[in-house]
Amino acid sequence: MTAELPPQIQNQIAQLQQIQQQIQALAMQKSQVEAMQKESKMALDELGRLADDAVVYRNVGELVIKTSKEESITKLKDREETLSLRLQSISRQEERLTSRFKQLQEQIQQALGPRAQ
């Protein structure tokens, strides 16, 4: 049936499929960022339960480094903020792509409407 479709509609269908793949990739990224956010929050909660003079270690690449509770809290809060901004960015991209997806879908349906009759 695609051989019968005009090139413009074939192109729109290809764009639609590409946008759908991008939306799926963004959903995966969003899920990963949300998981990292959850981990950071759990770590902050645990740090909150520790005494102020507690010995804290953190991973830096392949190393485990001794650090202060305050420094760990600061780094985790910075990480949470960065992840939150990333999540907002992903959500905006998702909204734009979803809007474009719906728009293309309507254009294709309108173009195919008279052919279906």
Swiss-Prot record:
Transmembrane segments: none
Family under the similarity heading: Belongs to the prefoldin subunit beta family.
Cellular component aspect of the GO annotation: cytoplasm; prefoldin complex
Subunit architecture: Heterohexamer of two alpha and four beta subunits.
Protein keywords: Chaperone, Cytoplasm
Protein name: Prefoldin subunit beta
Species: Methanosarcina barkeri (strain Fusaro / DSM 804)
Alphabetical list of CDD domains matching this protein: Prefoldin_beta_GimC
Molecular-function GO terms, alphabetical: protein folding chaperone; unfolded protein binding
Annotated gene: pfdB
Source organism superkingdom: Archaea
InterPro entries from the UniProt entry: PFD_beta-like, PfdB, Prefoldin
Subcellular location: Cytoplasm
